[in-house]
Amino acid sequence: MSKAAIQFFRGVNEPVVPDIRLTRSRDGRTGQATFRFEQPAAIAPETMGDITGMWMVDEEGEMVTREVNGKFVNGTASALEAVYSWKSEQDFERFMRFAQRYADANGLGYSQSQDSDQTEGADNQQA
């Protein structure tokens, strides 16, 4: 079983663990996960190459988003923000399986927002 990982460059795992926030439509069919990486290795000065996407890789395969933006402070890259969107319950369930594997691989926990409408049902998903 391969370890779940996030990559900005194919084959290179990002060591910085992001803050991840989920939002879902009321019917649960659509939604998005916003990933925020503070000082990720992918934007270190010694890293050469353009970031063209964020890959979420695990034993089932990979998911990708091309919606990746840099955040700058005083002209210096300080963070990356990526948004992964889903359009069906199956896509959401697949994302949650990845998220559980990624959390397990990185010793992370899950906490539900005070605004339960945004993450309703997310904590009931089984890996």
Swiss-Prot record:
Compartments (UniProt record): Cellular thylakoid membrane
The keyword Iron is assigned to this record: no
Pfam families from the UniProt entry: Psb28 (PF03912)
UniProt gene name: psb28
Protein name: Photosystem II reaction center Psb28 protein
Organism: Synechococcus sp. (strain CC9605)
Cellular component, GO annotation: photosystem II oxygen evolving complex; plasma membrane-derived thylakoid membrane
Keywords: Membrane, Photosynthesis, Photosystem II, Thylakoid
Keyword Cell wall biogenesis/degradation attached: no
InterPro entries: Psb28_c1_sf, PSII_Psb28_class-1
Principal location listed in the UniProt entry: membrane
Biased composition (Polar residues): 109-127
UniProt record similarity statement: Belongs to the Psb28 family.
Assembly notes: Part of the photosystem II complex.
Entry membrane topology: Peripheral membrane protein
GO term, biological process aspect, one: photosynthesis
PANTHER family in alphabetical order: PHOTOSYSTEM II REACTION CENTER PSB28 PROTEIN, CHLOROPLASTIC, PTHR34963
Stretch list, region Disordered: 108-127
